[in-house]
Amino acid sequence: MVVLGVDPGSLHTGYGVIRYDNAGFHLLGCGVIRLHRRKSYFERIGEIYRELDSVIGGYAPVRLALETVFLNKNVQSALKLGQVRGAVIALAMNHRLELSEYAPREVKAAVTGRGAASKEQVAFMVTRMLKITGNPATHDVTDALAIALCDLLKTGMGSAAVPQSVVSSGSAGKKNWAQFVQSNPGMVVR
C-alpha cells in the first residue's frame, strides 16, 4: 500500500510518500514545493498541481491523505489554503486515488499518542517510525509524512508496525506515554 501525504500551503506544500508492507513502513520520497511570492496566486496553485502530479506519476500511490483546514483568524489565508486543498483534491480525483483527510490533532495523536504534541515531537516520531537518519528538511516534510502515517494507521494498514505503547488509549496509553518519555528524555521539548 502506497500513500501520499500532503501538507498544503500557498507558499510551501510538503509531501511524503510511504509504502507499508509486511516488513513495515518504507519512506519512498518526500519534499517541499517552494513557491515564490512574486508569482500570481493562480500560478502557484498550478505549480502545486503540476509538482504533485509528477510525484503521483513517479510513485503511483493508491491513496492521498491531507490535513483538514486549520481555522485561522485571517480569512484570506484560510480561503487561499482552501483553494490549494481544492487543487490537491481535484488532482487526487483525476488520478482516481482514494482520498482521506484528518484534523491536525488526529494526525498528532496517531503518530505521537498525544493530540497536542509539538511539531518537534511529531518530527521525532516520524523519523523514528520511518527510520530516517539525519534531519528531515522542514516541518512541512515531517507533517506530510505524519499525515501519510496517520492514514496508514487509521485505515488499519500500518497498525502492526507501531509499538502498542504508542497507539494505546485511555489510562494505559497515558502510562505508556509517560514511560516512553521517561525512557527517552532527549526527546522532550520544554
UniProtKB/Swiss-Prot annotation:
Annotated PANTHER family: CROSSOVER JUNCTION ENDODEOXYRIBONUCLEASE RUVC (PTHR30194:SF3)
Matches recorded under Pfam families: RuvC
Classification via InterPro entries: RNaseH-like_sf (IPR012337), RNaseH_sf (IPR036397), X-over_junc_endoDNase_Mg_BS (IPR020563), X-over_junc_endoDNase_RuvC (IPR002176)
Note on how the cofactor is bound: Binds 2 Mg(2+) ion per subunit.
Listed NCBIfam families: ruvC (TIGR00228)
A GO term, aspect molecular function: crossover junction DNA endonuclease activity
Quaternary structure and interacting proteins, as annotated: Homodimer which binds Holliday junction (HJ) DNA. The HJ becomes 2-fold symmetrical on binding to RuvC with unstacked arms; it has a different conformation from HJ DNA in complex with RuvA. In the full resolvosome a probable DNA-RuvA(4)-RuvB(12)-RuvC(2) complex forms which resolves the HJ.
Gene name of the encoded protein: ruvC
Binding site for Mg(2+) 2: 67
Cofactor(s) this protein cannot do without: Mg(2+)
EC number(s) stated in the UniProt entry for this protein: 3.1.21.10
Family the entry assigns: Belongs to the RuvC family.
Principal subcellular localization: cytoplasm
Biological process annotations from GO: DNA recombination; DNA repair
Keyword Hydrolase: yes
Enzyme class: hydrolase
Localization per Swiss-Prot or TrEMBL: Cytoplasm
Ligand binding (Mg(2+) 1): 7, 140
Name of the protein: Crossover junction endodeoxyribonuclease RuvC
GO cellular component: cytoplasm; Holliday junction resolvase complex
